[in-house]
Each structure stands twice: as structure tokens, then as C-alpha cells.
Amino acid sequence: MVENQRAMPQPEMRRIRRIHFVGIGGVGMCGIAEVLLNLGYEVSGSDLKGSAVTERLESFGAQIFVGHRAENTVGADVLVVSSAVNTSNPEVATALERRIPVVPRAEMLAELMRYRHGIAVAGTHGKTTTTSLIASVFAAGGLDPTFVIGGRLNAAGTNAQLGTSRYLIAEADESDASFLHLQPLVAVVTNIDADHMATYGGDFNKLKKTFVEFLHNLPFYGLAVMCIDDPVVRDILPLVKRPTMTYGFSEDSDVRAINVRQDGMLTFFTVLRRDREPLDVSVNMPGNHNVLNSLATIAIATDEGVSDEAIVQGLSGFQGVGRRFQVYGELPVEGGHVMLVDDYGHHPREVAAVISAVRGGWPDRRLVMVYQPHRFSRTRDLYDDFVQVLAEANVLLLMEVYPAGEEPVPGADSRNLCHSIRQRGQLDPIYIERGVELAPLVKPLLRAGDILLCQGAGDIAGLAPRLLNSPLFVGAKVASTEGKLK
């Protein structure tokens, strides 16, 4: 379906004509707004500044306001807000005063899912990639799903799209427990880790119970697809009173991977499924964590009747997601070039998975890493884990912590991380103060054949394109969306 082709609004929401998003440029908001636009609703939204995202929505017919003001809500039948927006926001305050409904983004997503065949992907890590893989395999199988993803699906050029089938594939966000709004027919749990613990009062058992509650939102005829390689997911499995299908490398998995082999960006493996012939597949992403993401996809696709041919095609043709081990291109250095990679990972487990993928696909190459921790609270809570995993790089440059609205926490900053990593004796990290231009610092450290990884969830997101366009790297080669050099 053409992305901006208009469909009919949902009859169940016939009283709603104009929907206003507060913070419409956010990654969790813009996708829902785009789907609603394509369903025929009037959409408006505000954000603190314009962006490529808001320009895209404007091109589809959304009315965009820069800044938050009470008058932006005129004509709105409902306001959609993210968890970062509170009642002190002038638009929210005005809506409440005028008795205009104010709903969390997850509740609006739940309404889109309510009358569709919903597939919700939850878990601390791997949600975006797994959701994207499912959408790609379903598309290869001719099912034309609607999808709402927390990252840019390279093949589609967007993080959301309205399909013609009843399938709706979306991420389920545990960071604020808003995934409890969703009532899908199929739910995935990739893993459960200690992150966003403030939402759960610092109680890991409460986090585990919330995931069980999420799975119990499934109907009795639904399906919970669970990765039992993760010890916490395995731990909650007996508590889930819904039909389940398990996946992983474990021998007791319902869907299992064997014979994994990695060759650069390509990963090859064989899938074993109960009462099925073995299936040989490949995916254009490195690392065992992406094998697990692929297994979740294969489990759901098999259960939904997608053919093996479409599964193989959808996985092998997958072009990746923005900032998930995204190969940006090559930087010229003396004697050759350096592969430039950008990645969103910001939890020690995600960092470890990416480093493992680099070692598996390019065992003879050095890893030069520029890393930016995200949030002081996360750095504090997972400090020792960060020290251990970041010490595995060959060369490490640490940018200062991206605060994401938090106040500094004593001891939980990048200068202290550098000191702790240095004490391990494996490498001597370089501390980067805020505002320092990276290209002149990075270039002397690079050797031909290196892999340069820019990783983190903060404003490091703009570093890879800046390096690619830096006058210090004249002749840099840009990669296509498939990670191939143009």
C-alpha cells in the first residue's frame, strides 16, 4: 500500500476526528501519528523543535506546531501524550480543563490493535529488530501488515506503515509499564533485564510480575513466544497461563538454532522446529543476538502459516534498522580504510552483544569504539557491568554521559568510568568532554582495517554522519541501506 494512501477511519472511533500529539516528533509517537493519518484522521502535533520526522508528517497532511501552547489544542477531540509529558504542559492542562480526553501513546496504540490481529514484541533488548524482522517476513509472505516500530525500517524508509491486512505488529514498551495497555493475540518476550527500574520502584520481582501480567493480557487462545535462553524468561515460564512457544539455542526450545556461522555481516544457521524439516536460513546482521531475534520471527511466522520460502526470503532480504549495527560507510586512512558502524545500544548487555558480533564477523580486526553512556541513573546502577564490557574494546573513547533530563549523580560519569576501566589494565580509555569535536581526536587512532563503532542512545547519534562528511576524511564512501558501499 502506498504510505500516504488514505483508508477509512475505524468505525469504533467515529466520534474522533482530530487527534493531537504532544511531542509528536518522538520515536514512539510519530509512527502512531503516521498510521492515524493514513487511516483518514486529522492529525496535529507539537514539539519543541522541528525535525525530519515532523517534516515527513507535515508532508502527509499533519499540522505541526513548534513549541507547546494552549491554543495548539483548538479543535482536538483527544490528546495523545508520551510518558515524558506531564500535567504542567500547557496543552495537557488546557485539554483537562476543557474535558478533552488525554491518553498515553500506548493506549492509542492499543486502540489501533484492538480490532486487528495484534502481535506485540516486548523485552528489554531486541524489540525494534525483532518487530522489524516480523514485519519484513510477513511482507515477504504477502500478508502486508501494519507496523509501528521504534526505529527506522531501512527497506520502508519509515518506522510505521499502514497495511491492507488485519495484522498489526508493534513494539510493547516496558520502560513505563505502558505495554499493559496492549491486548495482542501474539506476544513476544525477548529477554528481561534490569533497566528502567525507577518505574518498578527498584524491585526486580515487580518487573518480572509485570511481564507475566502483560502476557496474561493475551486471550486464552493467544500465544506467548518466549526466549528461554534468557534465565529470567525461563524463570517466569511456569507462571504464564497461556499457550506458549519457546525459542533459543537451548535443546528444549520449540524453535532452536544450530550450526551458526558468521561471515562479516552475514549470519547463517539452521532452524529446528517440532514436526518440521530443518530449515537453513541467513540474515544480513551479525551476532548471536540477531539469531535469537530471527528465531522469534520464525516461530511466529511458522505459527501464522507463512511459508518456509517466504521466511527464508524475508530474512535474507532484510535491510536492517536505523542505528542497529548500521554500516554508514568507509573512512579513508593511511594504507586503506576503516568500516564505520553506528549503533543505538546503551545497556551493558547490548554493548556486549555488539562487541561479540564484531569479534565473530571480523576476528582479525581492531575495534575502535566511541561510546556515550545514556542517563546518570543507568550508569550508576550498572556501573561495574559497563566497566567490564567497555574494557573489551581495543581503543575506547568515552563521551560524557547524555543526561536525558537527569541531574548528575556523583561518581556516575564518564571520567570515573575511564578511571575504573584504566585500573583493569586492559586499555587506556580517552575521556571526551562535552562540545569537543571528535574527528581530529579519532583520526590519529585509526589504522587500516579497523572497525570504528559509534554507540549510544544520546546525541552521539549524529556522530557517524559527521565523521563521514568531515574534511579530515575526504573520499569517504557512503553505504547503501543494505550496508553495501555505493
Curated annotation (Swiss-Prot):
Enzyme class: ligase
Binding site for ATP: 123-129
Residue ranges of the TM segments: none
Cell location: Cytoplasm
Molecular function GO terms recorded: ATP binding; UDP-N-acetylmuramate-L-alanine ligase activity
Cysteines joined through disulfide linkages: none
Residue ranges that the Swiss-Prot or TrEMBL entry lists as coiled coil: none
EC number(s) stated in the UniProt entry for this protein: 6.3.2.8
Keywords assigned by UniProt, alphabetized: ATP-binding, Cell cycle, Cell division, Cell shape, Cell wall biogenesis/degradation, Cytoplasm, Ligase, Nucleotide-binding, Peptidoglycan synthesis
Organism superkingdom: Bacteria
GO biological process terms on file: cell division; cell wall organization; peptidoglycan biosynthetic process; regulation of cell shape
Reactions the enzyme catalyzes: UDP-N-acetyl-alpha-D-muramate + L-alanine + ATP = UDP-N-acetyl-alpha-D-muramoyl-L-alanine + ADP + phosphate + H(+)
Primary site of residence: cytoplasm
Pathway the protein takes part in: Cell wall biogenesis; peptidoglycan biosynthesis
Gene Ontology cellular component annotations, sorted alphabetically: cytoplasm
Family (UniProt): Belongs to the MurCDEF family.
PANTHER family in alphabetical order: UDP-N-ACETYLMURAMATE--L-ALANINE LIGASE (PTHR43445:SF3), UDP-N-ACETYLMURAMATE--L-ALANINE LIGASE-RELATED (PTHR43445)
Role of this protein: Cell wall formation.
Name of protein: UDP-N-acetylmuramate--L-alanine ligase
